[in-house]
Amino acid sequence: LFCGPRGVGKTTCARIFAKAINCLNPQNGEACNECESCRSFNEGRSLNVHELDAASNNSVDDIRNLIEQVRIIPQQGSYSVFVIDEVHMLSAAAFNAFLKTLEEPPRHAIFVLATTEKHKIIPTILSRCQIYDFNRIKVEDGVEYLRYIASQEGVTADDEALNLIAHKADGGMRDALSILDQVIAYS
């Protein structure tokens, strides 16, 4: 269970984990980006990673459809990774429908649940999860990454402006990148 404020990288980390765990030639725990599994992931055609946005797909039927997918053995790589974003939005009935699968998953299935509101997840689900807390990104780290992105885009960026963007984003890299993108677009 990845917990933390919006925009700090929970879903991105879940995707990176899903890619790395299925890499056929991992290097120091990192995905190689060259094997067929990594290439299919990078091109958006991996059949081993399944994402469910529980904010809009939160019914028992949505979970039952996911449970049906869990039964399918991966065609490439070792694992099927199921990322359930905004998991706190599942209905109580959907949580209960999911519980047995979470308790006794097939060997090839890994679930990564992401939430901004851990307190809304029923205790029976929480007790079956390893919990990882994500924190807001420090302003100086945000500035450093924004500087990197600006240089990659060939954009000259003033440190004071990057600092202001990082402050306005309040520790959310997604928001910082969105603000930077808007500033670049209107410059």
Feature roles, as predicted:
Residues 19, 43-47, 62-65, 78, ...:
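Extended, largely alpha-helical regulatory/partner-binding modules appended to the mid-to-C-terminal parts
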Residues 1-131:
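P-loop/Walker A NTP-binding region and its immediately flanking N-terminal helices
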